Amino acid sequence: MTTQEIIEVIKGLSVLELNDLVKACEEEFGVSAAAGVVVAAAGAGAAAAEEKTEFDVELTEAGDQKVKVIKVVREITGLGLKEAKDVVDGAPKVVKEQASKEEAEEIKKKLEEVGAKVTLK
């Protein structure tokens, strides 16, 4: 199997399947994917004085119109129905990581229009 074929297979995986793949790779090779995140977080401290350009969009509360919120979460994330429902039921959950300011504001607006409470971090 070529590198390109592996990439194509990975592109077809859901978020939950990707999470399982990362965990399996960590166990198989005795590494941690979190190590890179720690390094990135250390560098982010210096950039904190500058204006923040990337945001995590957190679904804080689903509100009364849960079905509509699930539909919007599916639209934003590309998740299947069950995965999107799990995200909404498990609120507070991050629905989009490292979104640009404009994208984060747009996602927040869409979710708030259907009654959800959203926090940008």
UniProtKB/Swiss-Prot annotation:
Gene Ontology CC entries for this record: cytosolic large ribosomal subunit
Molecular function GO terms recorded: mRNA binding; structural constituent of ribosome
GO biological process annotation, one example: translation
Keywords, alphabetical: Ribonucleoprotein, Ribosomal protein
Chain segments annotated as transmembrane: none
Pfam families for this protein: Ribosomal_L12, Ribosomal_L12_N
Gene3D superfamilies, alphabetized: 3.30.1390.10, Single helix bin
Function: Forms part of the ribosomal stalk which helps the ribosome interact with GTP-bound translation factors. Is thus essential for accurate translation.
Subunit note: Homodimer. Part of the ribosomal stalk of the 50S ribosomal subunit. Forms a multimeric L10(L12)X complex, where L10 forms an elongated spine to which 2 to 4 L12 dimers bind in a sequential fashion. Binds GTP-bound translation factors.
Family stated for the protein in its record: Belongs to the bacterial ribosomal protein bL12 family.
Protein name (Swiss-Prot/TrEMBL): Large ribosomal subunit protein bL12
UniProt organism field: Lachnospira eligens (strain ATCC 27750 / DSM 3376 / VPI C15-48 / C15-B4)
